[in-house]
Amino acid sequence: MVPAERPQAAFLYELMLEYPLREAKGLRPALCIATCRALGGTLEAALRPAAALELYHNAFLIHDDIEDESQLRRGRPTLHHLHGVPVAINVGDAMLALSLQPLLDNIGFIGLGPSLRILQAVARMARESAEGQALELEWIRRGQWALEDEDYVHMVEQKTCWYSFITPVTLGAIAARQDARRTEQLAEFARCLGIAFQIQDDVLNLSGEVGAYGKEIGGDLWEGKRTLMLLHMMRHASARERAEAERILSLPRPGALPLPRGPELEPLLEQLVSRGELTPEGRERLRHALAESQPRAEEKTPEQVGFLLELIHRHGSLDYARRVAREWLRRAEQSFTACEGWLLPSEHRHLLQALLSYVLQRVK
């Protein structure tokens, strides 16, 4: 899918492979293919939708890492930390553009009607994902903490469930030429599974080990994300604890302030990188060193993040989140049971069923 005949853009296409070639779960294409095959569809029918989903996912990760100022992705530095924000944004944009081609190629394999339905589903997925991300960013921007669990679930449905669970299952069902009723039943299974998955991901962010998790431990606290644990802790904290927690969460993380981008400095840095006299990593270190020499507002400290984590443990918020995740998993099991009768007995159905136990047992 990556063009080999465009040498002038070789650097772009090389970076487009950066995230996909890192060790990952491959969850979205696996869901799409397993659903299609469990419904009697062919591997050929599911391959292109699955490839488009994986391209979209990696593009979303690049942009999400920039928006969240994340430092690690799949156990290695994020793309914007390695190559700078402008390059990373462009790589993400290119991956989104490239994801359209396999969807158009579908027409020659599954016909015009199913291909258009898949395009409609992907368009819905993109809109829901962007709205969910916007909702979370707005909560952080406004310092909004007057939120209930239902608000969190709604955000997760949009930001995570649509592109990670609902749409992969939906595309697999469409590729297998299933009717709307069965497709909707599978989508409900995927929705409940996705909510449980995201809650567990949030739990791992605070309790996992970086070697297994592959992302920054405690990153959600550094970024001030509204997770189920933080919302629960805020509801049960004393007024004094809550006020201090809100103050800490409103602070930027170290290095989050805009780095210097002087009109003379940037072209020089780019020239040094292009001539091989400075590595992309060295460029970023130089930018940060220059930024450190500038006066800064107060930033979060490790001690403050540790205080937030201690409050979460003190008020039983991790255990609460685990209980809620188990309830959503129970709903997913009920939804899967309703579908089980018309899923073909196969390794593909087994994979879908195995996800029910995997979601809460996973460590990354």
Model-identified regions with their sequence ranges:
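All-alpha prenyltransferase/terpene-synthase fold signal
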Residues: 1-364
